């Protein structure tokens, strides 16, 4: 069943003042017509369409018996087949004035005239149609001053409301004036109102005429307010449109007058400058044609238009880009070597590769050179290497920071249709450099993110691919720009963070951490002079002896790079600067024993001997994104049921390494002289300190084996040894990565002997010579080699001894 409330006003009309009679008797059931979204008032005429199956039968029964219908509103319009409980209790008795069946869809169209109110009493079942016992509610015709006064006000307010309707005529006002009964007047006006069916039902259920008039008055007042507000909004909108059209017409007339008088100097000057800039930019023909077309649009555009400034900004971007390729300076390899040696200490392998790169470019300037990616921990000189390449090539240097970039538009730019659109970071950097053959450093390439606005790493593929970047198209520019002459250099901390397709387009150069000797040389050559200048001091005012500098490196920093070292040196010089500012004649010599009063207590000290003085404690080596580090592993045994307890936030790989190590120890009880008959009566607890730091990796197997074996043998591990390597269940020591970083970490921690897999022997060539000379390396084929080398021969008498 559907009843469209939008059709109510079009076919509603007053039916007169006399109370209509009905052929239904109070003791006969009344056939019900449930409706969804319309309320029929007494005296009103409404069209209905019966489309639901049961409702069709109800209508047919009423027409066949020539009986009236009980039109009643459903409580929930979503109910398809309403029951007695789904209907409101008060409805309107209606006579069927007209009835037509549609041949297309079989729907029943009928026009009903409301007669009087009724109240549902009880449903009547078994008739084949929906019917109910009802109680008629005849309209009271008693008149009193209160009712008459409200009726008069309602008549006036209704006329006011009709006057605000856009297409209402005087016939409706005259029809309302002809109604004398106040109750019928209220019903008629309520039926005309555009208010929700629930509110109309509330008025229908108000039997007291005085209260009904009040409710209709409130509804009419609300509609008047809405109509007035709508009228005001419409007038304001029309006024704004008219004003805008008037202003546009006046501006066009003013522009015509100014053109005739030659007074439009400012915009003409701007167009003239852009025309000259296009001619001087030496753009490719395709780009120049596009720019002149945009300039023509600009000349025809009103200066006050919002598009005017956008077009000017776009043309400025096009003309300020370095389109022609400048002449390249010849590459001087000797000068390049001198620049690299002056700016960087150590890094011989990396500097040699950069010189090879420059040599190839000198011999084949038009060849497709590889893209170098400097990979290493923070503070080892990745960015400064890019600057040195730019100095050696005598090209401008520009840096593009990619850390945290998660929107593809930051690489390719935004389309001009967006408010505040700008070119991407690549084009912006080229304009900043002022040359199409600049050296561009893509910093923190491994920190590229990925969000809902696309994948920036995928956008970088077009930038770095030599086959595509000759016609790179920025979304803002909309024209191709040649990036093939740019020397791209990238930096990253972790290779895992670089997308695979990007890695394939680059040559990775590892920059390891510095040794203590290298840090000392870097501090003397670069950091100390730089911090002296930054603090406004001279060498005569502050003296930093070699012993003090080594103490700062050893006791106050422990990093792969030198940034923290530079901060500590700066803190010392700032302390001296304060003294000099107070007394210009001051000369300070900072001895090592004064560092504690300036920098505080020592932050790092060697604790290897203390940690490994007991059985079950071994020093392992770990690799981190910021360099190598020492990893202490502790094992202990307690009475229990043979459980293995692991703590220290170990990852899945390390947990499996401990399981494999324990199994290997059990399988070698005889050779290790361990009584394994009580394994099921003891729990073994393996702990890696610094439990707040997650740890994982495939290189702790040998260290785990040594820790458990040392514990069960009751023998301590040598305090000057550290070990790395993975194991198999056959006891074979497997190779691992990060050897150089791990060895340098051992050197910083005071370790003199490093045990590592024999298959990692070629990696020792990457370790600086001075570091190799200070250490002893033991190559392991099996875990038996590690036991012989690192576990002391004599048992330690301690409460930690375990007899299993």
From Swiss-Prot:
This is Lon protease. Residues 612-793 form the Lon proteolytic domain. The keyword ATP-binding applies. Residues 30-224 form the Lon N-terminal domain. Keywords: ATP-binding, Cytoplasm, Hydrolase, Nucleotide-binding, Protease, Serine protease, Stress response. It is an enzyme of class 3 (hydrolase). It comes from Paraburkholderia phytofirmans (strain DSM 17436 / LMG 22146 / PsJN) (Burkholderia phytofirmans). GO terms for cellular component: cytoplasm. GO terms for molecular function: ATP binding; ATP hydrolysis activity; ATP-dependent peptidase activity; sequence-specific DNA binding; serine-type endopeptidase activity.
């Amino acid at each position: 069943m559907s009843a469209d409330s939008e059709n109510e006003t079009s076919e509603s009309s007053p039916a007169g003042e006399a109370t209509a009679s009905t052929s239904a008797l109070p003791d006969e059931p009344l056939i019900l017509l449930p409706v969804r979204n319309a309320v029929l008032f007494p005296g009103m005429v409404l069209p209905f369409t019966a489309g639901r199956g049961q409702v069709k039968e109800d209508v047919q029964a009423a027409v066949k018996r020539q009986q009236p219908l009980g039109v009643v509103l459903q409580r929930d319009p979503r109910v398809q087949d309403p029951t007695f409980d789904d209907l409101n209790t008060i409805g309107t008795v209606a006579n069927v004035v007209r009835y037509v069946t549609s041949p297309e869809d079989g729907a029943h169209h009928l026009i009903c005239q409301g007669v009087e109110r009724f109240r549902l009493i009880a449903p009547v079942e078994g008739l084949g149609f929906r019917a109910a016992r009802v109680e008629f509610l005849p309209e009271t015709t008693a008149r009193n001053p209160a009712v008459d006064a409200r009726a008069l006000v309602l008549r006036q307010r209704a006329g006011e409301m009709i006057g605000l309707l856009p297409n209402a005529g005087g016939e409706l006002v005259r029809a309302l004036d002809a109604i004398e009964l106040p109750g019928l007047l209220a019903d008629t006006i309520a039926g005309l109102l555009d208010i929700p069916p629930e509110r109309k039902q509330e008025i229908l259920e108000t039997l007291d005429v005085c209260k009904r008039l009040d409710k209709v008055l409130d509804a009419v007042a609300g509609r008047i307010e809405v109509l007035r507000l709508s009228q005001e909004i419409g007038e304001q909108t029309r006024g704004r449109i008219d004003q805008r059209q008037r202003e546009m017409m006046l501006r066009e007339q003013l522009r015509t007058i100014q053109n005739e008088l030659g007074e439009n100097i400012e915009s003409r000057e701007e167009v003239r400058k852009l025309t000259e800039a296009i001619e001087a930019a030496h753009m490719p023909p395709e780009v120049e044609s596009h720019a002149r077309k945009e300039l023509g649009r600009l000349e025809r555009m009103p200066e006050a238009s919002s598009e005017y400034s956008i077009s000017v900004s776009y043309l400025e971007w096009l003309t300020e880009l370095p389109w022609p390729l400048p002449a390249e300076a010849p590459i001087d390899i000797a000068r390049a070597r001198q620049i690299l040696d002056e700016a960087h200490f150590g890094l011989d392998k990396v500097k040699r590769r950069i010189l090879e790169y420059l040599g190839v470019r000198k011999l084949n300037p038009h060849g497709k050179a590889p893209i170098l990616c400097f990979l290493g921990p923070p503070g080892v000189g990745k960015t400064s290497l890019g600057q040195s390449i730019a100095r050696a090539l005598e090209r401008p240097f520009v840096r593009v920071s990619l850390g945290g970039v998660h929107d593809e538009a930051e690489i390719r730019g935004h389309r001009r249709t967006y408010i505040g659109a700008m070119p991407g970071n690549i084009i912006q950097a080229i304009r900043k450099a002022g040359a199409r053959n600049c050296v561009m450093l893509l910093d923190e390439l491994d920190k590229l993110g990925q969000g809902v606005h696309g994948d920036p790493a995928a956008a970088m593929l077009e930038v770095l691919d030599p086959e595509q970047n000759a016609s790179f198209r920025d979304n803002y520019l909309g024209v191709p720009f040649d990036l093939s002459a740019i020397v791209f250099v990238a930096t990253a901390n972790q290779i895992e963070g670089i997308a695979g397709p990007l890695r394939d387009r680059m040559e990775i150069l590892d920059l390891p951490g510095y040794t203590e000797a290298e840090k000392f040389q870097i501090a003397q050559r670069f950091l100390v002079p730089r911090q002296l200048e930054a603090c406004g001091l001279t060498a005569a005012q502050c003296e930093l002896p070699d012993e003090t500098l080594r103490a700062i490196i050893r006791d106050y920093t422990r990093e792969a790079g030198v940034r923290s070292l530079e901060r500590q040196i700066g803190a010392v010089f700032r302390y001296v600067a304060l003294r000099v500012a107070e007394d210009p004649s001051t000369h300070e010599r900072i001895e090592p024993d004064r560092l504690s009063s300036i920098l505080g207590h020592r932050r790092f000290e060697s604790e290897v001997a203390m940690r490994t003085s007991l059985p079950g404690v071994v020093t392992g080596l770990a690799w981190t994104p910021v360099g190598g580090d020492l990893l202490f592993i502790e094992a202990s045994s307690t009475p229990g049921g043979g459980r293995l307890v692991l703590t220290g936030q170990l990852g899945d790989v390390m947990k499996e390494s401990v399981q494999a190590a324990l199994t290997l120890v059990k399988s070698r009880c005889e050779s290790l002289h361990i009584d394994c008959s009580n394994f099921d009566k003891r729990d073994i607890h393996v702990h890696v300190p610094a439990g707040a730091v997650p740890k994982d990796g495939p290189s702790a197997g040998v260290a785990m084996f040594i820790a458990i074996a040392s514990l069960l043998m009751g023998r301590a591990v040598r305090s000057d040894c550290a070990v790395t390597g993975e194991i198999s269940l056959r006891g074979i020591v497997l190779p691992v990565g990060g050897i150089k970083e791990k060895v340098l970490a051992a050197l910083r921690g005071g370790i003199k002997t490093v045990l590592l897999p024999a298959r990692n022997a070629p990696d020792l060539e990457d370790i600086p010579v001075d570091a190799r000379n200070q250490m002893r390396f033991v190559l392991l084929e099996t875990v038996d080699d590690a036991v012989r080398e690192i576990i002391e021969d004599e048992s330690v008498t301690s409460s930690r001894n375990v007899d299993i």
